[in-house]
Amino acid sequence: MKKTLVASSLAIGLGVVAGNAGHDAHASETTNVDKAELAQKALTNDQSLNESPVQEGAYNINFDYNGNSYHFESDGSTWSWSYESTNNATQPVQPSQSQVATQQQPVQVSAPQNEQTAQPQTKSTSTSQTSSSKASSGSSVNVNSHLQQIAQRESGGDIHAINPSSGAAGKYQFLQSTWDSVAPSQYKGVSPAKAPESVQDRAAVKLYNTGGPGHWVTA
């Protein structure tokens, strides 16, 4: 994707540790961290982890819990979190990160991308912006902010993206059968990744308006 951080279905981020003037919290000082609660939030991709750090101040926390290795850090203004499996899995899993910047401007939030297979997870980036409906870059189609977030989580906004494991393609990672049900006649049977961005946007808006966001696992 086109932002700085990586996200996958097995990657999360947490931030825990208070900080105050003249004193930075270190991992050794975070004995009050509720590992079970943080791990559960990570595994369920609790949105609160992307919206704010769990405590104020700088921190750097690492721990292993129930077969996963967790990492959380913050410099006091930005925070990141990630985890990766420490078990011997049948398929390799690549860790990824998610980072949120605290600014006066619209907050940029990254979130893990969900995969519904046991295939190797591919690295991707994800950034969502809180904004009103607007036209996508290179497209005159008005796409609502939720659908923009879905596109970022699915492909990072790459209209030519193709998932090698599932075959999903395009900006919104359409499966071919789903694409054929909403695409214009001249693009039916054609890979979504080969269609112009405006065509992909219209198809996604049509699918969203008729069936809701449930067609995307990252919604």
From Swiss-Prot:
Give the GO cellular component terms, alphabetically: extracellular region
Family under the similarity heading: Belongs to the transglycosylase family. SceD subfamily.
Molecular function (Gene Ontology), one example = hydrolase activity, acting on glycosyl bonds
Function according to Swiss-Prot or TrEMBL: Is able to cleave peptidoglycan and affects clumping and separation of bacterial cells.
Identify the domain of life: Bacteria
Q: Where does the UniProt annotation locate this protein?
A: Secreted
Which portions of this protein are annotated as coiled-coil regions?
none
- Please give the name of this protein: Probable transglycosylase SceD
Leader sequence range is: 1-27
Region: Disordered, residue numbers: 86-143
